[in-house]
Amino acid sequence: MNAESGSAVEVFRTVSVPLTQARAFALFTTRMTEFWLKEHSIGASELAEVVVEPRNGGRWFERGVDGKECQWGRVAAWDPPRKVLLLWQIGVDWQFDPEFETEVEVTFSEDGLDRTRVDLRHRNLQRYGDKTDQMRAIFDDPAGWTGTLAGFVDLADAQATSLH
């Protein structure tokens, strides 16, 4: 699929973590700094913190070690413990663009006793126009959403171990 086809383009990943749905949601949304790949930063200084403001319309941004904030997007839907829908407003130049958005939907569903399935769908990548295939390849790369979710799984595993 390419941008010219007009079809929706997305990247989809799923993982299962040894936490309840509520704990998995809270861990993902409140401790993103701990699993976000540090090299995935758009700020001038080193990444210090990733913040998801816990409400519809909240900001999604990074704070650098210099204290400066760089907005990534906003929270379009806040539905704990089931779903968070984040608007990714970073263009092909890796800068925040308030006029541009793709969607990162993360859902949390029970997956057995004290386990949660986490589905991440980064959709509407066709909005990158003639750079759609390039951007999809970046998000689809092992260093993209796969790496981010691997960090989340590691954090969830450590959290589950500390609970027992």
Model-derived segments and spans:
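Short, highly charged C-terminal tails/helix-capping segments
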Residues: 44, 49, 153-164
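Hydrophobic/aromatic beta-strand elements that line small-molecule binding cavities or substrate pockets
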Residues: 13-15, 50, 72-77, 101-110
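Hydrophobic pocket/interface hotspot
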Residues: 24-28, 60, 75, 86, ...
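Glycine-rich portal/gate segments that line the openings of hydrophobic small-molecule binding cavities
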Residues: 46-91
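Beta-strand/loop substructures that line and gate deep hydrophobic ligand-binding cavities in soluble
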Residues: 93-143, 163
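Hydrophobic ligand-binding cavity/cleft-lining segments
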Residues: 1-47
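Intrinsic-disorder/low-complexity, polar/charged segments enriched in Ser/Thr/Lys/Arg/Asp/Glu/Gln
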Residues: 8-16, 59, 70, 83, ...
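A short, structured loop/turn motif at beta-sheet edges
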Residues: 18-22, 76-83, 107-117
